[in-house]
Regions:
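A short helix-loop-beta submotif of the ANL/AMP-binding
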Residues: 34-40
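Conserved coil-to-alpha-helix start sites within the AMP-binding
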Residues: 1-4, 24-28
């Protein structure tokens, strides 16, 4: 959670827009609101299974959008993007010149079907991509709170200052 808060502190300013694919953990919304940014939530839909209307998400990303937040595999629904959907989203945020914050802490916890792919497998070095991951979920280390942010190199010093 700290990694998500740090990413929001780096990217969002007052009046910016954050697009969130929901449902999400309530603290995600709080991280956006604390920056005095506006939340535009695109909800997953349920009809026998959870799905994301990709067109709704793409249309929600406007010129005011600075950050798109996606938690896949999703907590609490278990919904998960496939790699072709990830590519479409990544291409769109490139076009819109906004940041993609991918919470991938559950990427190793998949019980049916193919394993979750990471946005990192599709990204280029200059992409505005931030990926949150954690040992807490994947390696059953919840009490340790060990996590990391994969980010463009130029953000490293800024992130280090916020952590300290």
């Amino acid at each position: 959670m700290l990694g998500i808060k740090i990413c929001c502190e780096i990217i969002l300013e007052k009046g910016d827009e954050g697009v969130i694919v929901g449902p999400v953990w309530p603290n995600i919304r709080s991280s956006v609101v604390l920056r005095e940014a506006v939340i535009n939530e695109v909800s997953l839909e349920f009809d026998k299974t959870w799905t994301l209307d990709l067109n709704k998400l793409l249309n929600a990303i406007t010129d005011k959008t600075k950050l798109v937040f996606i938690n896949s595999p999703n907590n609490p629904t278990g919904w998960m993007l496939n790699s072709s959907e990830q590519q479409i989203i990544l291409d769109h945020v490139r076009k819109k010149n906004c940041w993609l914050l991918a919470d991938e802490v559950y990427h190793r916890i998949v019980y049916q079907g193919n394993a979750s792919s990471s946005f990192l497998s599709l990204s280029e070095p200059d992409d505005k991509l931030l990926v949150i991951n954690s040992s807490s979920k994947s390696f059953n280390m919840t009490g340790w709170r060990v996590g990391w942010i994969t980010h463009p190199e130029y953000l490293g010093e800024h992130i280090a200052k916020l952590v300290q």
